[in-house]
Structure formats: structure tokens, C-alpha cells
Amino acid sequence: MAIYLDFENHIKEIQNEIELALIRGDEDAKEILEKRLDKEVKTIYSNLTDFQKLQLARHPDRPYAMDYIDLILKDKYEVFGDRHYNDDKAIVCFIGKIDNIPVVVIGEEKGRGTKNKLLRNFGMPNPCGYRKALKMAKFAEKFNLPILMLVDTAGAYPGIGAEERGQSEAIAKNLQEFASLKVPTISIIIGEGGSGGALAIAVADKLAMMEYSIFSVISPEGCAAILWDDPSKTEVAIKAMKITPRDLKEAGLIDDIILEPSKGAHRNKISAANTIKEYFLDTLRTIQQDPHFLDNRYKKLMSLGSFVESMPH
């Protein structure tokens, strides 16, 4: 059963009317209602607030990394473990083919259903997850395979055990090593891009965001609690933080925005997966045709956060 957000109530009502028309066999009513539905969808989704985009990024039906992997990766083989401590189910690593091109895919997976969410730690990786990702990145480099990374996490797991095993070191090591990988790397934020937990697999030649995803240094709720000591200020925090793809593209922090199907990726997972596949293939071709892609990656990373300070007269 489809889950509708509060701002989608009119869409839900029209959809229910369409289903009733189908039961009655009333094709004329169905056609009229479908046109009305299309108009309503365009009106709502062309005027979304940043808070509503955050709701879409966290939608329980939104495609996760495993959904996309199952749809676009063929002849896939999952790789486990970090060769140091354990296998972190919050990060998945696969070898396979996208359109007959051998690739390595690394993704953050939140899981569906209570049992699976607990197994995946709600998509919050431990250090062994980031070390597993680095192990696979080095494997890809050794065998000259391009890397696709799918980012979707509220953040790195903040537990005591994670800190004892070097959470910050694991993330920092990934930032360092991914920056110098000698193979094409493409990272896509498919839902939530939460702070260092996202950055650990977001250093790439090209960093893209799905249309209704977010990327931030802290959750808006956390920001509201720290700055205003008031959770009701979440919407104010979102505006101030500039966490949407459009804001981040304007700031030069991401390279591309991947458009989603009408009503969001959760309403048409196959279409969303095909869009990601085409983006990956097109971007990969562009990177492979550039003999200086490593230099360009380095220049891009070094330019992040740079600014010019005017001297007082």
C-alpha cells in the first residue's frame, strides 16, 4: 500500500477516486481523474518547500541502495568483511556489470522492515563498513574497474564501540584514499547525505544528487536543537543550512542533479534506476575520455571551501 505524505493528501484522494472508477468500470471518469491527477502532481511538486524535500528524502518507500543495485547491476557478486574486524551490513559492496561494463558498486543500505533495519543498523555504518568500502575501492583500482557509490545515511554510527574502533580515522582514511584512486569514481546521493558518514563514500570525480535528496553536516533537527534549543525550528534550520541539490549546486559543492520521476523516485523505482544507470554510463564515458581526470579531481577537491577575503580600505 502506497504511503502518502501530509502534503500529498490531494494526490491520495484523487488516486482513491481513480481506483473506485476502475472498480466501476467507468473509463471516462478514470480519464478525467488521471488528467486532474497529473495537474495536481505538477502543481504540488513544482512548489515544494525545503522541508517537504527533506520528507521525500526520508520517505519509507524511497529506493535504497539495494533496490538500485538489484535493478541495474547484472552478474553481481557481493563481497563481505573489512579484513580487520567484522562485516558491516550498513555498507554493501558488489562486483558486477552495468550495461556489460565491469564495475564495483558501494552503497549505504538502510534496510526495510524492523529485522532488516536492525541488521543494517538503520544505514549508519561502523568503522568496519568504511574499511570494507576502502578495501573494495582498492580492489577496483587494482583491476582497473570504475566505481559507483550510492550514498544514503543519516550519519556514521555514533556508538561507543564505533568510536573505540576508530570511526573518525576510518572516515578520514577514506577521504584521503578515495581522493587519489586511479580509476573513475562516481558518487550519487540517493536519499540522505548525513555528514562524515556520507562523505566517506562521496569523494569522487563526479558527485551528483537525486532531485529529492539532501546533503548536510548535521540533521536539521540537530541543528535546531543546538542553535535554538527548539525542535520546532527545524524548517528554519533547513533554510539556513542550504541542504537541497539546487543550493549545493549553486555553491559548487556538487556537480550534477539527477531528475526524479513524477512524484519522486519512490513512485517509480524502475524509472529512477534507469535514470541513475544512464547518468553513470554517460558520466563514465566523459571521465574515461579525459586523460587528466585525476588532476581535475584533485583541483576540484582542493577548490572546495575556497574564498576570497576583501581587504578593508
UniProtKB/Swiss-Prot annotation:
An annotated Gene Ontology molecular function: acetyl-CoA carboxylase activity
Pathway(s) where this gene product acts: Lipid metabolism; malonyl-CoA biosynthesis; malonyl-CoA from acetyl-CoA: step 1/1
Residue span, CoA carboxyltransferase C-terminal domain: 36-286
Gene Ontology CC entries for this record: acetyl-CoA carboxylase complex
Compartments where found: Cytoplasm
InterPro entries reported in the protein's UniProt record: Acetyl_CoA_COase_a_su, ClpP/crotonase-like_dom_sf, COA_CT_C
Keywords: ATP-binding, Cytoplasm, Fatty acid biosynthesis, Fatty acid metabolism, Lipid biosynthesis, Lipid metabolism, Nucleotide-binding, Transferase
Catalysis performed (reactions): N(6)-carboxybiotinyl-L-lysyl-[protein] + acetyl-CoA = N(6)-biotinyl-L-lysyl-[protein] + malonyl-CoA
First-listed, main subcellular location of the protein, grouped into a coarse class: cytoplasm
Source organism, top-level taxon: Bacteria
EC number: 2.1.3.15
GO terms for biological process, alphabetical: fatty acid biosynthetic process; malonyl-CoA biosynthetic process
Family under the similarity heading: Belongs to the AccA family.
Record's function text: Component of the acetyl coenzyme A carboxylase (ACC) complex. First, biotin carboxylase catalyzes the carboxylation of biotin on its carrier protein (BCCP) and then the CO(2) group is transferred by the carboxyltransferase to acetyl-CoA to form malonyl-CoA.
HAMAP family attached to this UniProt entry: AcetylCoA_CT_alpha
Complex and partners: Acetyl-CoA carboxylase is a heterohexamer composed of biotin carboxyl carrier protein (AccB), biotin carboxylase (AccC) and two subunits each of ACCase subunit alpha (AccA) and ACCase subunit beta (AccD).
Name of this chain's protein: Acetyl-coenzyme A carboxylase carboxyl transferase subunit alpha
